[in-house]
Amino acid sequence: MTDESKRCRTKKVKARTGCSTCKRRKVKCDEQLPGCKRCAKIGVECPGYHKPVKWSVKYERHLVNSSPTAGNSFSCFDSGAGNLSNLMQPKSNPGSVETQNHNDNEVQAPGPLTRGSSSSLSDAREHLEDTLEMQPPSTLNSEQLSTLCDDVQADEEFPCALNALHDDSLCLTSYIPTLQTSLILDHYFTTVCHFNSSFDSANNPFRSEVSRMMADSPLLFGCVLSMSAAHLYQGDKSSSCIPLEFQTEAMSHLSRTLSELPTRNECEVDDNRPMALVSREKILNVSDDLLLSIIFLGMTAAWHDVSATGLPHLHGSRQLFRSWISLNNLTDIEKRRKMTRTQIFVVSSMVYWEAMSSALFDQQYEGLSHLTMFCDPHPPALVQPCPWTGVATPIFVFLAKTLTLVRNNQALKSLWVFESGEIHRRALYGELLAKANSLEREILRYRLPSLALIEDIGDPCTTPDHLLAISRCYRMAALLELYSAFPEITRTGGRPDSAIDLDRGDEKTHLIMGLAFSILEILEKIPDDSGTISIQLLSLLIAGSVLGPVPPRGEDEGPKRLETLRLRTFVRQRIHKMYAAVRLGPIGNAMAILEEVWARMDMLPAIQNANSAISSFHWINIMSQKKLETMFG
């Protein structure tokens, strides 16, 4: 070929348009309508010629807020997503491609998920089935992980249309994960599922139920990515924006889903005023995955920011949970005894969330009435262990109610500033005491399941007796808090377990210290590698907070002082091992609260007894004073 012909030859311009099928095959697309000829030739449906764009959360926020139903009772989710969006700075994502239309402004944002064309559905399905496979934790070596990353690199080069990304009619198998998404999803199944449950095996609902549901729920999929990213990048300041992006995306998706729920107004009896009727908005369709998504976002809010409590999510989820109960006819005791595994998982997760949150804010005792139906004093014939509540979900209902009464009692102390405050305080205290007496009887009446009736979970590290021991600990923790706040109850002579053998001198002090010692001695017998270590934190905090005061060396070298010091050491070591295994900020807050409680108790004059020390320095008060509120679950 002559030089002149080379110069005359028209320069080929690389096409950046066309359907994604032709792009993947790296061939030129003729862009015919309704579909290109090459797709017709190979016998696939042409996906069309959408221009690739990058999604901006700020525009998504405006769309959500402009929804005709955005002003409903779930506006807290919209504001939460908006606040997170405002914290984010624009940052380009190397795994996405910018639009080539320079006449329009380029839209720049993270876009955690991308969707493949319809011709690549089988590839996406095969990839996700491999990723979601029920495999034990930490079984992927570095070579396998590298292969997993290589498999999705080619898919990152071809982002797809935005309207397909947020199409909830499409199942998860329509999505092709980016490299980053694949790493985060792998981290969920290899690490988060392992430490976020009291047991881990193929029976772990975080593996079995969640993976099954999120295959058809982009919302749940986004929430899983949010919590996994929060743990994966924990403490990595250079990558702190990544989990924030996934959290914002999940909250925006949640806001959008809530705004589309069908509702109707109904008149119901007010829980606080039995003679009054109130108009309430009833949700007509609440799915399991929607409830779990909100629970996951609320429970893991502190993974993103240790000071986050997740309470805005809790307040919104209660209405959804009540509607979910009604839709599933769970007010019928026979229906409750025949709940599916998914329903048991949802109920236990909601109850655990309520228990962990009840120490963080003041609420009316009647606000937890919707949980009472799940406190059947007679366990079913075969108990299915739950990731967070173990084998005794009712115990955590009792704990939630107990901590609510404790906070109510603490709030009464502020009435002294009023001239007639003491009169009102005594009247209100009498009401709380009556509720505390009734609650104590419920706790003592509840029968823990026998070891033989606990379903095998297939985890050699977490045996059924570990789960049963945790249930005993939390039952005693609830009683400890109840007796500490309402000492009059101790005169009834009730005892939670025959294993507790106490003197009858100072009823309150001996009973509380005896309960604390019993809790910690039970926890000592549970090995450090037990999966239950993930749900021990609040019991350690409650029992550890009454270990004192310890007089200075030389004043009292008796067995009580030595035992108190020994148990304090155990609490420190167990919490440190818990942090080493889980590596989440809220664990550090719990240890800081205990150290402050112990320091203040030990500074009391020697003439003051343990009773006054426990009353003066309750861990909830210290938590509030030091601004250490967080989710301890």
Swiss-Prot record:
Residues 87-102 have a biased composition (Polar residues). Residues 19-46 bind DNA. PANTHER family: TRANSCRIPTIONAL ACTIVATOR PROTEIN UGA3, ZN(II)2CYS6 TRANSCRIPTION FACTOR (EUROFUNG). Pfam families: Fungal_trans_2, Zn_clus. Transcription factor that specifically represses the expression of the gene cluster involved in the biosynthesis of beauvericin (BEA), a non-ribosomal cyclic hexadepsipeptide that shows antibiotic, antifungal, insecticidal, and cancer cell antiproliferative and antihaptotactic activity. GO terms for molecular function: DNA-binding transcription factor activity, RNA polymerase II-specific; transcription cis-regulatory region binding; zinc ion binding. Residues 87-143 are annotated as: Disordered. SMART domains: GAL4. It comes from Gibberella fujikuroi (strain CBS 195.34 / IMI 58289 / NRRL A-6831). It comes from the Eukaryota. PROSITE patterns: ZN2_CY6_FUNGAL_1, ZN2_CY6_FUNGAL_2. The lineage of its organism: Eukaryota, Fungi, Dikarya, Ascomycota, Pezizomycotina. SUPFAM superfamilies: Zn2/Cys6 DNA-binding domain. GO terms for cellular component: nucleus. It is found in: Nucleus. One of its GO terms (biological process) is positive regulation of transcription by RNA polymerase II. This is Beauvericin cluster-specific repressor BEA4. Keywords: DNA-binding, Metal-binding, Nucleus, Transcription, Transcription regulation, Zinc. Disruption phenotype: Leads to elevated expression of BEA1, BEA2 and BEA3.
